[in-house]
Amino acid sequence: TLIALLLTVAGCAEVQRAGEDIARQSGNPRLAGAIHGVGNVVGSLFPIGYEEESSIGQAIALQVVARYGGVVDQPELVRYVNLVGRAVANTDRPDIPYRVAILEDESINAFAAPAGYIFVTRGLLKQIRNEAELAAVLGHEIAHVSQKHILDVIQRSKRLAGVTEAGLSYATSNPAAFKSVIDGAVKKLLDEGLDQGKETEADMVGELFATRVGYDADAYVGLLTRLRDLKGDDRALFKTHPNFSARIDAVQKTIQGKHLAATGVLLQERFSRMTKRV
C-alpha cells in the first residue's frame, strides 16, 4: 500500500510521530499519511506538477522531522514564524502553500523541501536578532522552493531514469524504487548540500523577497557576518551551505546591484517578544 511505501522511507514509529507533529503545525491532517498520490510521482516526473511535487515534498519533510528530533510545540511561536514566512512568500508560484516548522535541534541550519515545507532549527532561531533577519532566512529557503532547486536535483538523478521508465506499477509494487529517489534527495539536502550556484541564487532571490515587503536589506548581511564570526568560515557550522564570506559578498553585490533599501524595518522588539521562549 502507499502507507507501507511511506513507512519504508523513514521508519514506522518515527514517521508516525513526525507526521502527527507536522500535520498539527501545518493544519493539514493529510500529512500524517504523507504520501497520497505517490504513484503518480514516478509515472510523470517530467515535468513535475504540483500534485507530484507535493508528494515528494511530504516524504522529504517527514525524513527531515524524524532526523532532527521532531518539531517545536509552541503554537504562538510557530504561528508567528509562519506569518513572517507567508509575508515573504509572495513569489511567482502562488500555488504553493508555504508552511514553516521549527526543528527541535540546537544545530544552526535551515532547510526547504518541495511544495513549500520550510524548516529552521531552534539553534538558528537563537542566533537571529530581529524579524528582518528571520525574513531573510525564510526568504532563502522559500527561494529554494520557488526556483525548484530540489526538484532539479531529483530530475537529474541517474536513479530517477530507471524509476520513471518503470512507471506506476513498478513504484507501487517496489517501494525501494521510490525510496531511492527520496533518499537521494534527502542525502543531497541534509548531508551534501546543494551546489554553490543554487545556494547563491537562493540568497539573492530570498533577499529580494524579504526587502520587497519592507524588511531591511542589510539585516541578512548582519546575520551571516555573526554566524561567520562564531567559527570563522568553518562550513561545518552551516554544513550544507557555502562558506559565509562568499555568501556575504554575493548578498552585498545583490543589494548594490538591485539598489535594495538598507532603510527597511528590523522589528527587533517584536521578534524578541515572540521568540523569548526559544
Regions found by a protein language model. Name each.
Residues 1-10:
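Bacterial N-terminal signal peptides
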Residues 12-278:
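A Zn2+-metalloprotease active-site environment signal
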